[in-house]
Amino acid sequence: MGYMAETIYTTRDINRAIRAQMKKGAATRIEGLTGQDNIAVGLEGDVKITIIGEAGDFFGALNCGTTLLLKGNSGRFLGDTMSSGKIVVEGKASDGAGANLHGGEIIIKGNAGGRIGVGMKGGMIIIDGDVGDELGVNLFGGDILITGNAGKNVGRSMTGGNIFVNGKIKSLGENAKALKPGKSDKLKLTNFLTKQNLMGEFKFKKVISKREIPLDTIKSAFGMSIKKGLANEEPEDI
């Protein structure tokens, strides 16, 4: 395993060290991260990188196939526009984790901020903790799983994908509804939880799109006055 125990202070130096180890095909361990932005951005290749310390914004953005383990907290936009690979955070994450995610997995073993999975199109986000407001806003696809509580406007303007919340939901956003998970959902959840060694008694609610096209989009495009009762199903009490 490539190992760098000395403290490195600049984003440029850290990323150079990571790429140098990746060229050798070696697993890499970096220590001394102190909040630098844009660490491990745009990496390609089936290599595992362990980073110890506090990451700034855009950690692991544009990831394509690399496994990143962060032993510490992350700033905003963790894994932004990631296409494949895996990011595990053994700590908390700030706002916007998994924004515009296309594929791969993001696992946060702690609480996270707001707007998790905004604009997400595929892949998986698992958060073993609570999240802030606007979870899954503008969600197009993929799965988001929260073992704790969620804030306001969950699933606002979502048109696809699934959001699973085990705890309390402060409020649903426009175009979102909450249902009880079906048999296939329960099997999927069991597989997700078992894979991450998350054990316990879970009672998830499933949040999905109420309409195929968000109400705001229809109003804006056609100048129509549409009543909220357009959908046949109403969200269950949460």
What is each of the regions a protein language model found here?
Residues 1-2, 11, 15, 34-36, ...:
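Extracellular/periplasmic carbohydrate-active domains that bind, remodel
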